[in-house]
């Protein structure tokens, strides 16, 4: 993991959308965001905005809470949006095909702690926190994503 860390206050849904729109065009196959935070902290809202920005259209992006995985076809790399909250063991994640997705898709993983020690080493971590007025996201960019995203998210 990178030592670079930045926190961004997102005052409303439009600010979350804007951040996702800045990030989306720079993602490549094999990129993974580990999305941390309590229920209602903004993980799904960010994922929804990033998926829509990446696909370039208003897409129905439901929370994968009950399906565990929602997959979206993108010519430049499929997008996997995963909610692992209901998993009880890391092996269950790999029964879903996540190991292959980590290599060949763009992955947005909510509740990544369910992966245990099997979290991808090249993943960036976004920690969301609900505030009285909006949300805060603390971004830890991985070494592989830092060159493409550091200027986009505000690292010097």
Language-model segments: residues:
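Short phosphate-coordinating micro-motif centered on Lys-Gly-acidic
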Residues: 6, 90-93, 99-156
